[in-house]
UniProtKB/Swiss-Prot annotation:
The keyword Heme does not apply. Transmembrane segments: none annotated. Residues 29-75 form the F-box domain. Keywords: Kelch repeat. Kelch repeats lie at residues 199-248. Residues 1-29 are annotated as: Disordered. This is F-box/kelch-repeat protein At5g48980. It comes from Arabidopsis thaliana (Mouse-ear cress). Residues 1-11 have a biased composition (Polar residues).
Length: 399
């Protein structure tokens, strides 16, 4: 009898139950993953966010983890954050704008359109685009209008276009982790933009530069506003050394000039710069490492400060980048230290209902201290849009 029991145990039969039946019962009653939550969190944090859409389909628990603040904190601690380009477009006859993000096939070999002689096999591969603008489903309503979108980490702040209404309304911001709109506390008097080290600096009314309301400071961590003290403001061109230079859209109607602010965030110090006559190209410009880039009349222009002197020039190189039509809409954006260019291909007024948006990624290199060269890493057709669409903004978020 003892030998029979030992044989049954050795063969996996116990209490008359075959092992496969007990295994099936065990699987049916186990709903939790075998790995601890912290381990799953670390594993998912190391995965490119480009895969998150597909991973969210695995289970509700995965979907919950992929949108949790803990995941993005872990990605930051592990140094796994990525830059994602967000693009907002307005389509005709639609009340709310549409949001898109630049989707790039993970670990892809960059498409090289700059080489004139290519193999036939490579040409076939390039016919299917690996870069595209993928639509985003926003879970709640958009702000009606804004004059600027400010990117701070994984938040996109929508600054009001109406300075009269700005002090009386909260500041909406898009949480790029969950794609939901939230509201920051209302500001006192401010409506233009830039950000640095988690602090948003907003120049206010030009008519009263000595007012306490002239510059508002918003701390994104504490979600509080406060004015810059008068003694911390310096509106002199000679005081711009080692300060960050950026655009704004004030207009001095008397001189026909655009105004920009330069600031040093740690010391709450501001400076005022007079630019050329305000034009629409300023609205599509972007800042990369304290240098402003914009597109005007077929050229990519850069502008920055060399000590106390304002310097500028044309981006050299750019081999392979197609020429844009004079009627094309062009938008520039900073994307992980590189320049992203969005433009549309011109179509005649009649006979066409749609057009194509193209996108290029350009790496920048300073040479000889006075030149900036651009290398076109790739460009692709990324989205088909109605002919009368409008680009509202393009900016990168860190996730």
């Amino acid at each position: 009898m003892a030998d029979s029991q030992r044989l049954s145990t050795a063969s996996g039969v116990k209490d008359g139950q075959p092992p496969w039946k007990k295994k099936k019962l065990s699987n049916d009653t186990t709903s939790n993953p075998s790995l601890p939550y912290d381990v799953i969190l670390i594993i998912l944090a190391r995965v490119s966010r480009s895969y998150y859409t597909n991973l969210s389909l695995v289970s509700k628990s995965f979907r919950s983890i992929l949108t949790s603040p803990e995941l993005y904190k872990t990605r930051t601690l592990l140094g796994k954050t990525e830059n994602f380009l967000y693009v907002c477009l307005r389509f005709p006859d639609e009340a709310n704008p549409r949001w898109f993000t630049l989707y790039r096939k993970p670990n892809q070999t960059l498409t090289d359109h700059t080489t004139k002689k290519k193999k036939k096999k490579k040409k076939k591969e390039e016919k299917s685009s690996v870069n595209l603008l993928a639509p985003i489903s926003i879970l709640n309503s958009h702000p009606v209008e804004w004059s600027a979108i400010i990117s701070v980490d994984h938040y996109l702040y929508a600054i009001s276009a109406d300075i009269e209404k700005a002090p009386y309304s909260n500041v909406p911001y898009l949480d790029c982790r969950t794609h939901t709109w939230n509201e920051a506390p209302r500001m006192r008097l401010a409506h233009t933009n830039s950000e640095f080290e988690g602090i948003v600096y907003l120049p206010g009314s030009f008519e009263s530069p000595d007012s306490l309301n002239c510059v508002e400071v918003y701390n994104t961590m504490t979600q509080t506003w406060k004015p810059v003290p008068p003694e911390k403001r310096m509106f002199k061109l000679e005081n711009l050394e080692k300060k960050i230079y950026y655009k704004s859209f004030h207009l001095d109607s008397r001189a026909g000039k655009g105004l920009s602010l330069s600031y040093k965030s740690k010391h709450l110090t501001c400076g005022l710069v007079v630019l050329d006559t305000v034009d629409s190209y300023l609205r599509s410009s972007c800042m990369i490492e304290n240098i402003a880039y914009f597109y005007r009349k077929g050229n990519f222009i850069w502008r920055g400060l060399d000590g106390k002197i304002l310097v500028y020039g044309k981006i050299e190189g750019l081999e392979g980048l197609p020429k844009f039509s004079r009627y094309s809409s062009v938008q520039l954006a900073e994307y992980g230290g590189k320049l992203v260019v969005l433009w549309d291909k011109y179509v005649p007024a009649s006979g066409y209902k749609e057009k194509m948006i193209w996108c290029a990624e350009i790496s920048l290199e300073k040479r000889n201290g006075k030149e900036i060269w651009g290398n076109v890493e790739w460009f692709d057709a990324v989205l088909t849009v109605p002919k009368s669409y409008k680009i509202l903004c393009a900016t990168a978020a860190t996730l």
